[in-house]
Amino acid sequence: MRVSEFWRLMDEEFSPSYSRVLARDLVLAGVGGNTASEALRAGFDPKEIWHEVCKMQDVPPSRWLGRDVSPKN
């Protein structure tokens, strides 16, 4: 997963403004006790970070992949 995909999923699930608050403040045990922002800077896999955020925020697994995006023509 690219970092841009991580942010797209965060924005879709939590809204653009609240996703930044979560990334800055929510401590994720699964990525070394870092916040999502810290974990991204430290080089953790964005997909791993996304899954940790989903677990901590009780996002249903059915929404972990986000919504379908149509390919550009």
Regions found by a protein language model. Name each.
Residues M1-N73:
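C-terminal alpha-helical interaction appendages
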